Amino acid sequence: REVYGFVIDQEKAKKLIADEIRMSNHSPLVINIPGQSVEPKIKASDMDKLGIKELLGVGTTNFKGSPKNRVYNIKRALEQFQSVMVAPGEEFSFVHYLGEVDGEHGYLPELVIRNNKTEPEFGGGICQVSSTVFRAAIYSGLKITERRNHSYAVQYYKPYGMDATIYVPRPDFKFKNTTDNYIMMQSVIEGDILTFRFFGTKDGRTTSIDGPHILERGGDGSMRTVFTQEVKDKDGTVFQKDSFASNYKSPSLFPHPGEDTKLTTKPSNWSNTQWREYKRLNP
């Protein structure tokens, strides 16, 4: 179902709100915010024309136990991927749609793996989104063109071996739409479960996944895994078969500062609204 948007005229709204508050004498207010209705880029009538008819595949991950900032960043990143359309033959780039990741773009500091350390940085947790998209693409029988596993196995991406790390500008996660119609990506969070669903037109292909299998597991937490994606056409002929190997190092090689990543002063590039939201999540 199509939904029309509403764009607020921020300058007019600021002046209107300030004027109404000034004249209210502390009484309750009902303010009609100025703005304009915006048509959806893709309407319901366009869906059949583009081939958005049925479910192709589903990917899920579980982020139970995530710190508040991590959950916040996951939800913020998801805003970039609602109803993304991937054209036939197009290569989807996660980093391209994600855009900038910093305080100015609404992200909070949380732990990331970078420079051989586990340290707080804006956007920690976004890989929950990229890993879920990876799984949806795999189960939809699409061609993965770029993917890298995390430096060490992270509990939020079980089963191990089906994660996809990203960092702007690289590493990126990419897949190619190998169908003859558009693919639409939709996501939802239910409790601690993040789900991506890919919609398009089924062409008779079937996808089978073998694994992931743990090939080797060290006492230091290091691990090697592999899984295989096999895709057959409507006649049962295999036309795509890829193995995805993951080599995880020991977590001890990446110093961890602990769970306390709280800021005590407002970063200079943050708005007051961002700082209030941060303090609300981190009392």
Annotate each predicted stretch with a short phrase.
Residues 2-283:
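Well-ordered beta-sheet/strand-loop patches within structured domains
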